[in-house]
């Protein structure tokens, strides 16, 4: 059942009053090179892009912090960057957005992740990735855990944003979960399909997309299971999650809350126009976690996250959703449902 306008407004209005959320994850930059193709190269059968615009945007877990900022939620970003010019750019972009850099750890053995998308108005031509996927070393792990331990004293919850770039391990994930659950604080996980599911055991909220959910339960030995309710129940039973949300793209979101009736609920998608899905999952986890911390039920939080994702998929590239856009989107959605 869709929320009332007053309830939705109340949840979103509470965002600015929340204590900061810690975001731990793989960090990087999304670069967009935009232009027009008018000819094919004489050197090879490839298009020639005449560049008209370029811009850099906070990406990966940094996009989660950027989305929290856009929703008027305070956060601290914690992760590893290289000792290179792109690491300086990460810090510059964070400072430009009014986000602190206290949680960044530099590692000269790593390359700062940088993803360049070459695109026209109608299609993406290619993507160029610069990154290191090797596991962080023991010294870097020790430094990360120390920062997280310190931040847990002043933060209301944590989002684990795993992009499979080498930051996370079972040791780090379980340490984060233990630190925050000892203080009865929310631990939300946006998983990587390449990481073993056991890494995330015991988290409060687990938010895979549908493809990730299938890959994860197959990794657990359930190769033929396709029923969403059964999948959600396997996740909460075997991995001891309190809440599960599976994002379904055009079909909305499926959720199961062990603190509720324990039955699967599905809400329809809030997106009525899709231009680019880049970063929509980051927006959703930011909005859902903020809503739960604001006292929303899982279903209410899912509606907020659903609408926030609906805002950003209408925009080009890694995009943000403001509080004003979120409220307006929900108002329009209610009118459509009526």
Language-model features: where?
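Residue-level marker for buried hydrophobic side chains located in beta-strands
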Residues: 21-23, 187, 206, 244
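Substrate-binding N-lobe of the ribokinase-like
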Residues: 2-9, 14, 20-21, 42, ...
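Conserved beta-alpha-beta core of the PfkB/ribokinase-like small-molecule kinase fold
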Residues: 37-46, 115-130, 134-136, 142-144, ...
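Acidic-leg catalytic submotif of subtilisin-like serine proteases
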Residues: 18-29
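Extended acidic/charged loop-beta regions that coordinate divalent cations
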Residues: 31-34
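Active-site metal-binding loops of divalent metal-dependent hydrolases
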Residues: 27, 163, 283
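Conserved phosphate-binding/catalytic region of the ribokinase-like
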Residues: 3-11, 135, 154, 171-186, ...
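Short, surface-exposed connector motifs at secondary-structure boundaries
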Residues: 69-76, 153-159, 179, 239
């Amino acid at each position: 059942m869709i929320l009332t306008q007053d309830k939705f407004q109340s949840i979103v209005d509470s965002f600015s009053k929340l204590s900061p959320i810690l975001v731990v994850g793989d960090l990087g930059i999304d670069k967009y090179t935009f232009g027009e193709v008018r000819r094919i190269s004489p050197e090879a059968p490839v298009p020639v892009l005449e560049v008209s615009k370029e811009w850099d945007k906070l990406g990966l877990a940094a996009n989660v912090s950027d989305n929290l900022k856009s929703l008027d939620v305070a956060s601290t970003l914690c992760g590893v960057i290289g000792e290179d010019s792109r690491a300086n750019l990460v810090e510059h972009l964070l400072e430009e957005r009014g986000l602190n850099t206290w949680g960044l750890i530099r590692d000269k053995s790593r390359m700062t992740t940088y993803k360049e998308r070459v695109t026209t108005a109608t299609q993406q031509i290619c993507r160029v990735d610069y990154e290191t996927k090797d596991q962080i070393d023991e010294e870097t792990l020790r430094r990360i855990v120390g920062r997280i331990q310190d931040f847990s004293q002043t933060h209301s919850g944590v989002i684990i944003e795993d992009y499979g770039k080498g930051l996370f391990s079972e040791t780090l994930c379980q340490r984060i979960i233990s630190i925050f659950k000892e203080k009865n604080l929310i631990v939300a996980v946006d998983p990587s399909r390449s990481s073993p599911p056991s890494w995330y055991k015991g988290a409060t909220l687990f938010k895979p997309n549908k493809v990730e959910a299938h890959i994860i339960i197959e990794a657990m030995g359930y190769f033929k299971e396709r029923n969403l309710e059964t999948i959600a129940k396997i996740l909460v039973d075997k991995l001891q999650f309190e809440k599960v949300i599976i994002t379904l793209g055009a079909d909305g979101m499926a959720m199961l809350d062990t603190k509720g009736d324990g039955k699967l609920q599905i809400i329809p998608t809030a997106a009525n126009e899709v231009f680019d899905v880049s970063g929509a999952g980051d927006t959703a986890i930011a909005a859902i976690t903020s809503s739960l911390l604001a006292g929303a039920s899982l279903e209410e939080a899912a509606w907020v996250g659903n609408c926030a994702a609906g805002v950003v998929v209408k925009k080009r590239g890694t995009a943000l959703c403001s509080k004003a856009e979120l409220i307006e989107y929900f108002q329009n959605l209610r009118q459509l449902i009526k």
